[in-house]
Swiss-Prot record:
Chain positions recorded as Zn(2+) 4 binding sites: 1548, 1551, 1569, 1571
Entry GO terms, CC: nucleus
Binding site for Zn(2+) 2: 1428, 1431, 1453, 1461
Name of the protein: Histone acetyltransferase HAC12
Organism: Arabidopsis thaliana (Mouse-ear cress)
Length: 1706
């Protein structure tokens, strides 16, 4: 017998093309299947190999029967088609596109070859284009398989006696009808492997039969993409003659049928009808059912059967996923009639009627018979045991295109299909022994086959009637496959055959449990089975039931998704016989009621609440498919554990069952709901309420169980998780395709109405037998040790192939095969596995925590937003995410996922706003996700790279942004001693932790010669230092949805980890949220639920800036409309802007010591009080208020001494480039520039109105790699150079000058270092305004230090600012005469400082808000301003005017001129006498200093490099602003003296220190307190956020700081100040603690945090609070290092600029 190889669209790594494989079986005419004219019929791909055939026996010769001329001809045609496709493309194709075109060309050529009648037709180039067009439209290719429909019906033909049974006539051999263009994802079409007859001996089993009948070949066809396609008995129709009088069957070529013929047909049954509907495109059913049918079986005499196999795999049109990869959506359903001849082993036939059955090891199949005419919905799955699996174990994943149908199973050496007799006998004996052992089990599970017409249910344990025969098992080899006989339909036309359109249906692959459990199954009633399996088509009246055959149809489109079928155990089926009358009656009923067939609607709720078999899990099937290696042992099948599993699931069902009572089909549901209600309020550990005590114990165990091998908890958790994953995956896939057709589902209520209930048994009971521990893939951020059983090695190969959700149009026009992907997944069951049903939330990774995140193995092909599969760029909606749409009759969401009531009853804190998307409308959510995939802020190359990842999403990818791994920008590290930044990938040393961590660069480490190193005055042993490399990468954290169990990046989900309440907060992903909102199951939260920018306190300053900004924006919009000539309403405007002052605190600036030493005699102030303010601009972008702009200012008021009196310093200003709309204003500048300028002008106007006289701006861009305020800027935003930045400021000042806000603009050098014109002011450093963080104060310290070293005779610093020191002679030459003491130092300082500043003097901008006196240069605020009538720039104050009048005429204005100008007074009015701020103090620990905010952002990775991150970072910044964190001291219970957790205690409203824990409060007689006790506020209570609550928290923080100061000064042992003793106790703890904060001591960390808060706000130079001085010195050092780096960068920039100027001039 021979094997035909039909390959199409082969890809690398798949089964090679196989040529004809001859075998010496006594029939020489069968040695060659392909003749000279028909060789190509065996080759559908032009590149088919010729010498790689595989037969049953490896010793047979391999002969290539391919005609090379035909192959070359076909290759030439492929090239023509390929060139034609390329010419149609507008742009040159890349390598990937060429590969796609070549694949399309290959399939088009195949269609052309099949269509061609003659060689001339095939080669005709004039008609080539029209033929290709018709092929693309899908008519010829789609109907190619129907060419058999007009051929003679083989079902009504019998062999012609006397004719030689040869297949030598090529015209009678039909190539595989699985067409790649129809299948869409066909990787391998029908590769028929001739398995031959294992028993080649003569007689009954060998060679040709003596009666002249052909010994039927057994064809095993491998389906496309790894699926098994059509498989049946081959018989040359040339030897068949029509049988008169028989009704012709309607053949469904795309149905999943089964056809089996006996090897020896008794003469009495020669005329028996053998209808064949195992069409060539039977992707699953006929293949799997045909596989393994033993050739040595005799037909049963009985002519009537009750198990007609449905030609359309029992698929109801409403259930079939017409968008799936194997569905022809344009076709209607096709009925097919079958004649199934069941077999039983010949050595078991003893003349009496024996129930026929067969067992197939390796591949296990079983048939379920709900109805004699509905046909068998079959499911095929691996039944191999551990000893049947080689090292490359196959792992079934219960889905179409899963590992069972993957081609790798069949890429075995030829000897994999061969069995030695001794092995076969051993396996037979082992099988029987195991069957006997199983019979001893107390519970015999059987599957009852019911004909659906009220016939007697027949129990059958068919294993007792089976004797394992050759070919049954493959020990340590791949499953041996034997095919039933299949008819190769010829191309002859037959008037009796009716053609019908086909509808393909996916079949689900279900693994079968190991051999030891092969007999077990659960009882099921007929109504269940009918609901599980609703075949639409009608089988013939002559069919038998098959044992060990089960096929479940998988409907992707319906919400329930999976057909309930036994996925773990080999289900045994009885042979229920019915009469022809009943068959005909049911036939009529089915025809008339076809459209009323009830489709299965299995949801998560119905699985639990009804007596169904289990839904199919993704990965728990692996446990049985690979044997005991990854199983938890037989203990999981203990009835005790099974009952506990059932009870847990039924509890979960009752908890979420809706409505609460009365309508649930299970009578026990209401009872369990009452039990839940009782347990919610029951606190009695010995409660006598029925089931209460034991249920609470079981739930308690379930909550706390961490055992990865627990036989109760792990299966339940696995089932719950995977049910939710599949539910949401189906919902995502439903609407993700370009267009879905024929998607109609029936609600769960209709299913419940027809479902039978088992009285007294929870309906979830039947699901538990299938629950096995599943794979839980751990998502690793850094490194971790996987949690796996010590004695098990559970590494398996999960082979999954993706599904395409094609629309009708996509299926016709582009059928791109999908690559199968093999992933190595290590079985690791984490301790923190999901416990979704009873209030246990999986721990989510927080910042700073490198915790592995479990992420479920999602269903292949259901990744991401559009349910798109890998390698499907052609049908992917790249820009618009797909969304699950509510179909008519779609079950409610709470039936698929956990209801909010469940989570709240299970004590999950219902914290509102844990994700900001909860405030969004569905459209805003969609807009947000669209924005995620735009990658705004990244460079074009990176953005395109990330966008390309959408087309290859995997289960590792984020479901929102479609990218898998995203890492943060590493925060900069600075050396503690020298302040230098440690470069990326450089080595360094570190010690300590948290705020006390110190870093040492290699040079500083090497400079310290001893065994210790000095850091901030503390000596540290070098032995404790840890050497590291600055190459750490931190991955973005993930969060898991509590409903669908899907994972997203926290940033993508706008998830607030601070609200997570220890990982227990309920989180709903955007997908589930949108579904809930659109189904009216929830409403978006009010905007007030999460406080935003508008909820921040308003101040006079913020109102002033906002009002001015909005007014000017209206004017600008009007101007734009005028310029563009359009109406005002048509002009885009700026929306949703919010300006707020987030910090306004009093500070003191201490004068540096060396500078103060010079001017101490002049009574120079030792410190300058000022107010530090932070102004932020927010704009709502895609529903999120994003911080776009910020500035720090220092206000030195009228109470401050000179030279800082009434001055303002613009300390830092920063922005990010996300402003919307990104357009130009009327004057040509960017609209965002207009807005930022108006904010600055508004602030200057506000300062002028308050009485400030000047503003100082240092136009200094940030260093490369560093930031001022907002951490990590986008790549698209270039850092401006100093000249560009300076011009930006000057443009703003020119606008302000036009409005009269700015009186004069100059620079620091011209105003203070020169005496030009009539200026009479002294040039001294004492006149320079002294600002915190400015350039010159730090530079002055360096210069003074250098001068001191010169005076001491020491060598100056080589890196000094000046190469040549300035001598007194030089000063004398310049006109300076006073060289005494400090005056000399002052002059030298001004000279050196002037030389330093002069090259960049334009960057130090002095803005005069009031007029300055020409003589003394003071800014006038009172009295009169004396103005010259002729000189506009000359004006004097009252004091200088009086002095001017006393001078001689030649010294008066104008100096040295005879004509004197008239000077007249102008009264100075409207300037306040003081600059007192009427705004309240606003404290913010995070915005206290620029460095504090930057550290917050760096430590928590609040980056602004992309809009995606900027939205999340701004959300978190607003959270911190609204929730100032008051330190939480440990509260002690006054009764039991144990610590009270936050929010879990009671406090007296009168007594300050009386607190009681919950346990003591509930105990009777424990509390004897006269005052009222109130509960502690918890995180859940923070939902009701309001401004009063925020003010209260601010007040608490202030009280805490006051308490710290009080405790540090208090000496009373019995102080009555609340919590004073506790703070003192912390002080004492800090003295004796050896662990310290750096070692992780909780108390020390709290104390350290409190001390830092105090030190930042402390203004006392001599403070009694411990470590206050040290902390302030630490902060000063950090600021000094930052200023030094800034100055050094400026000097380097100036040096480069000077070099450039010198180069150009030279």
């Amino acid at each position: 017998m021979n094997v035909q190889a039909h390959m199409s669209g082969q890809r690398s790594g798949q089964v090679p093309n196989q040529g004809t494989v001859p075998q010496n079986n006594g029939n020489s005419q069968m040695q060659n299947l392909v003749g000279s004219n028909g060789a190509a019929t065996a080759v559908t791909g032009a590149g088919a190999a010729t010498g790689s055939g595989t037969g049953v026996r490896p010793s047979r010769n391999i002969v290539g029967a391919m005609d090379h001329d035909i192959m070359k001809l076909r290759q030439y045609m492929q090239t023509l088609v390929f060139n034609m496709l390329q010419q149609r493309q507008p742009s040159p194709a890349d390598a990937a596109s060429k590969a796609k075109y070549m694949d399309v060309a290959r399939r088009l050529e195949e269609g052309l070859f099949k269509m061609a009648v003659t060689k001339e037709d095939y080669m005709n180039r004039s008609t080539l284009e029209s033929r290709i067009t018709s092929l693309i439209k899908g008519r010829q290719i789609n109907n190619y398989n129907q060419r058999h429909a007009n051929s003679s019906s083989v079902g009504t033909m019998i062999p012609t006696p006397g004719l030689s049974q040869t297949a030598g006539n090529p015209n009678l051999m039909v190539t595989s009808s699985v067409d790649a263009t129809i299948v869409g994802n066909t990787n391998i079409t029908s590769t028929a492997l001739n398995t031959g007859n294992p028993l080649i001996a003569g007689g009954m089993h060998g060679g040709n039969m003596s009666n002249g009948y052909q010994h039927s070949s057994r064809n095993f066809s491998l389906g496309s993409g790894g699926s098994m396609t059509s498989m049946g008995a081959q018989r040359s129709t040339a030897q068949m003659i029509p049988t008169p009088g028989f009704v012709n069957s309607v053949t469904n070529n795309n149905s999943g049928g089964f056809s089996a013929e006996p090897t020896i047909v008794p003469q009495s049954q020669q005329q028996q009808q053998r209808q064949h509907t195992g069409g060539q495109n039977s992707h699953m059913l006929s293949n799997h059912m045909a596989a393994g049918v033993r050739p040595d079986m005799q037909s049963k005499p009985s002519g009537a059967a009750n198990s007609s196999v449905n030609g359309d795999v029992g698929a109801n049109e409403k259930i079939v996923d017409s968008g799936s990869s194997y569905t022809n959506a344009s076709k209607k359903l096709q009925q097919g009639n079958f004649s199934l001849l069941s077999f039983c082993p010949d050595d078991l036939i003893s003349g009496q009627h024996i129930e026929s059955t067969f067992h197939i090891s390796g591949e296990g199949y079983s048939t379920t018979n709900p109805d004699p005419f509905d046909g068998a919905i079959t499911s095929a799955g691996t039944g191999t045991k551990a000893h049947n699996i080689n090292t490359a174990s196959f792992q079934p994943v219960s889905r179409v295109n899963s590992s069972l149908s993957h081609q790798q199973q069949f890429q075995q050496p030829p000897n994999r299909f061969q069995q030695q007799p001794n092995q076969i006998q051993q396996q037979q004996q082992q099988f029987l022994n195991q069957r006997k052992l199983k019979q001893q089990t107390p519970q015999q599970h059987r599957l009852i086959s019911n004909d659906g017409l009220g016939k007697t249910q027949v129990d059958s344990d068919m294993v007792t009637k089976v004797k394992c025969e050759p070919g049954m098992e493959n020990k340590s080899q791949a499953p041996q496959s034997q095919a039933s006989e299949r008819f190769q339909l010829s191309q002859l036309q037959n008037q009796y055959q009716n053609s019908g359109e086909d509808c393909q249906a996916d079949a689900q692959l279900l693994p079968v449990e190991s051999q030891s459990d092969i007999c077990t199954s659960l009882p099921q009633n007929s109504q269940q089975i009918q609901q599980m399996m609703h075949p639409q088509n009608i089988g013939s009246d002559s069919s038998n039931s098959f044992s060990n055959l089960a096929v479940g149809v998988k409907s992707e489109s319906s919400p329930q998704g999976q057909w309930p079928s036994k996925s773990q155990e080999n289900t045994l089926m009885s042979n229920a016989i019915s009469s022809g009358k009943h068959i005909q009656e049911d036939f009529r009923q089915r025809i008339t009621g076809m459209d009323e067939a009830q489709p299965n609607n299995l949801t998560e709720g119905s699985v639990i609440g009804q007596n169904h078999t289990s839904t199919i899990s993704e990965s728990h099937n692996l446990q049985n498919s690979i044997g005991t290696t990854c199983r938890y042992g037989n203990v999981s099948h203990d009835p005790k554990f099974k009952n506990q599993q059932r009870w847990l699931l039924f509890l979960r069902h009752a908890r979420s069952c809706k409505p609460p009572g009365g309508r649930c089909q299970d009578q026990n549901c209401v009872t369990v709901q009452k039990l839940w209600s009782h347990m919610d309020n029951c606190a009695d550990p010995q409660c006598l309420y029925p089931r209460c005590r034991h249920t609470k114990a079981l739930i308690g165990h379930y909550k706390n169980c961490k055992d990865p091998r627990c036989p109760v908890c792990v299966p339940v958790k696995t089932y719950q998780q995977q049910a939710n994953v599949r539910a949401l995956a189906r919902l995502k896939n439903e609407s993700s395709a370009v267009g879905s057709v024929n998607r109609s589902v029936v609600s769960n209520d209709s299913l419940s109405a027809n479902a039978g209930a088992v009285s007294g048994t929870p309906r979830c009971a039947d699901t538990l037998d299938n629950l096995q521990p599943s794979l839980k893939r751990l998502k690793v951020e850094q490194s971790f040790q996987p949690v796996v059983p010590k004695t098990e090695s559970c590494k398996s190969s999960i082979v999954s192939t993706t599904e395409a959700d094609l629309s009708q149009d996509a299926e016709r026009k582009d059928h791109r095969p999908l690559k199968s992907e093999t992933m190595e997944v290590k079985v690791e069951i984490p301790d923190n596995s999901v416990q979704a049903g009873f209030g246990i939330k999986e721990t989510k990774s927080e910042p700073f925590e490198n915790v592995p995140k479990p992420k479920p193995v999602s269903e292949p092909g259901k990744h991401g937003l559009s349910g798109d599969s890998p390698k499907q760029e052609n049908i992917k909606m790249k820009k618009e995410p797909g969304w699950p749409k509510k179909e008519p009759g779609c079950p409610k969401k709470e039936e698929l996922v956990e209801s909010p009531e469940l989570t709240s009853k299970s004590r999950k804190p219902k914290i509102k706003g844990v994700s900001l998307t909860e405030l969004f409308t569905p459209e805003q959510v969609r807009e947000h996700i669209r924005g995620l995939r735009q990658w705004v802020g990244q460079s074009k190359a990176k953005a395109e790279k990330n966008q390309a990842m959408e087309n290859s999403m995997s289960e590792n990818s984020c479901q929102l942004c479609a990218v898998e791994k995203l890492t943060f920008e590493p925060p900069p590290i600075y050396c503690t001693p020298c302040g230098a930044r440690i470069k990326r990938n450089a080595m360094y040393y570190t010690v300590g932790g948290g705020e006390t961590r110190h870093y040492f660069c290699i040079p500083c480490y090497n400079e310290s010669r001893g065994d210790t190193i000095l850091a901030e005055g503390t000596s540290m042993p070098k032995a404790k230092l840890e050497k590291k490399k600055n190459d750490e990468e931190i991955e973005e954290s993930w969060v898991q949805c509590d409903k669908c169990q899907a994972w997203q990046h926290q940033i993508c989900a706008l998830f607030n980890g601070r609200r997570n309440d220890g990982g227990q907060a309920e989180y709903t992903c955007p997908y589930c949220y949108v579904i809930d909102v659109e189904q009216n199951e929830r409403k978006p939260l009010l905007q007030s639920a999460v406080l935003g920018a508008k909820d921040l306190p308003r101040t006079i300053l913020s109102d002033h800036i906002e009002q001015r900004l909005f007014k000017r924006l209206k004017q600008e919009r009007t101007e734009r409309a005028r310029v563009q000539g359009t109406s005002y309403d048509e002009i885009p405007t700026v929306e949703s802007l919010v300006v707020r002052v987030v910090s306004s605190v009093d500070k003191k600036l201490e004068v540096k010591s060396r500078f103060l030493e010079i001017f101490r005699e002049d009574n120079f102030p030792t410190e300058f009080p000022y107010k530090s303010k932070v102004v932020l601009l927010f704009q709502k972008i895609e529903g999120v208020e994003v911080c776009l702009f910020g500035m720090y200012v220092q206000e030195f008021g009228s109470e401050c001494s000179n030279p800082n009196q009434r001055r303002v310093y613009l300390s830092y200003l920063d922005s990010v480039k996300y402003f919307r709309p990104d357009i130009k204003s009327a004057n040509g500048e960017a609209l965002r520039t207009f807005v930022y300028h108006e904010i600055l002008i508004g602030y200057l106007e506000y300062c002028k109105l308050r009485g400030f006289t000047s503003c100082y701006i240092w136009a200094c861009p940030p260093l490369k790699g560093e930031d001022y305020i907002l951490y990590c800027h986008p790549e698209i935003q270039k850092t401006p150079k100093s000249d560009k930045l300076r011009e930006w400021y000057l443009a703003m000042l020119r606008k302000a000058a036009k409005e009269g806000i700015v009186a004069e603009t100059t620079n620091l050098y011209d105003h203070f270092f020169l005496q030009t014109g009539e200026c009479r002011a002294k040039v001294t450093a004492a006149r320079l305004p002294y600002f915190d963080g400015d350039y010159w104060p730090g530079a002055a310290e360096d210069i003074i230090s250098q001068m001191s070293q010169e005076d001491d005779g020491r060598k100056g610093n080589k890196k000094g600012i000046l190469k040549k020191p300035i001598t007194k002679r030089a000063l004398k030459a310049s006109g300076q005469s006073d060289f005494s003491g400090n005056a000399s130092k002052d002059l030298l300082l001004m000279h050196k400082l002037g030389e330093t500043i002069h090259p960049m003097k334009e960057d130090f901008i002095m803005v005069h808000l009031q007029h300055s006196c020409t003589h003394c240069c003071t800014l006038m605020v009172t009295g009169n301003r004396w103005v010259c009538s002729q000189c506009k720039d000359f004006q004097l104050c009252d004091g200088c005017y009086e002095a001017e009048q006393k001078r001689e005429d030649r010294e008066r204005h104008p100096v040295n001129q005879k004509d004197k100008h008239n000077i007249f007074p102008v009264e100075i009015a409207d300037i306040p006498t003081d600059t007192k701020d009427r705004d309240e103090i606003l404290e913010s620990e995070f915005f206290d200093t620029r460095q504090a905010f930057l550290s917050l952002c760096q430590g928590n990775h609040y980056q602004y490099d992309t809009l995606r991150r900027a939205k999340h970072s701004s959300m978190m910044v607003l959270y911190h602003l609204h929730n100032p964190t008051a330190p939480a001291f440990v509260t002690t219970c006054n009764v039991c003296h144990l610590d009270i957790e936050s929010g879990l205690g009671w406090r007296c409203e009168v007594c300050p220190d009386y607190d009681v824990c919950n346990a003591c409060y509930k105990k009777e007689g424990c509390i004897n307190h006269p005052h009222k006790l109130t509960t502690h506020p918890s995180l859940a209570d923070q939902n009701a956020q309001n401004k009063e609550a925020r003010q209260l928290r601010v007040l608490q923080l202030r009280k805490m700081l006051d308490l710290l100061v009080h405790a540090s000064q208090c000496r009373s042992p019995v102080c009555l100040y609340p919590n004073c003793r506790k703070v003192k106790g912390l002080f004492r703890h800090g003295l004796r603690c050896k662990v310290r904060a750096s070692g992780g001591c909780v108390l020390c960390k709290k104390m350290w945090y409190l001390l830092q808060l105090h030190a930042r706000a402390c203004k006392e130079s001599e403070c009694d609070v411990p470590r206050c001085g040290d902390l302030k010195e630490h902060l000063r050092r950090l600021q000094q290092q930052s200023d030094s780096r800034r100055r050094a960068a400026v000097m380097e920039m100036m040096r480069q600029r000077a070099a450039e100027v010198a180069g150009t001039s030279g």
